[in-house]
């Protein structure tokens, strides 16, 4: 009897260990989100902790569509969010990710939610970049701030390999990237227009887009999951498509015109 009990106990442990994220979500009725504070996308009320922004609205709409409770479980970083997925600290990276091959290697990516632009920003008083062709940035005369392990680092290395790199840790606030340009530790930072507008609102030293105010890259924005969680991805993809077809996502985007997001890829 004792051996039978031990065998049963070990079997139950193995079963519990093998539970997928999808199975846990179905069992609990909850979807646990990792997130990164991102102006316009995920903003946190300092007094109440309430989350607001376009991707917050998107995720809450997905939760409603699937009859799942959304739990904003843990703050993470752009360069290390995949570690939290692998260690089951949260089920989905919900802040929104600029989709790339590099990120597809470390996380399972959903279908596209919408499209966002990445710009290069310099100090407003740095006249070197006024009307400068973008290809001229690929030179050792310029330093670009990137986040370790992030898509910004991949873009710098792919498009501007001859420029110098000023890297900041994935564990600290992305605002440090902005400040690196303000304090002249670097010349350029890659960011979304919303993040820089938020900074410029109260800043003495303003940042402005280079490249004649044209984006460096346009990215599809998605959410990320633990590699191998294809059942979870299928469920989330189906709900994303349903909300796109119903027009619900378009209504959400219309609330945030200042973010200049689009449902379709711009040519």
Predicted regions and their residues:
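Hydrophobic residues within well-ordered alpha-helices
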Residues: 62, 85-86, 137, 178-182, ...
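Periplasmic-binding protein-like
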Residues: 114-122, 193, 200-241, 258-267
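Bacterial N-terminal signal peptides
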Residues: 1-11
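Short amphipathic alpha-helical coupling segments at ligand-binding clamshell hinges
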Residues: 54, 58, 140, 192, ...
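A ligand-binding cleft/hinge motif common to bilobed small-molecule-binding domains
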Residues: 79, 96-105, 154-158, 180-217
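Ligand-binding clefts/hinges and TM-proximal coupling segments of bilobed small-molecule sensing domains
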Residues: 16-19, 149-166, 204-209, 240-267
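Extracytoplasmic small-molecule ligand-binding "clamshell" domains
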Residues: 17-97, 105, 167-170, 255-256
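Flexible hinge/capping segments at coil-to-helix
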Residues: 124-143
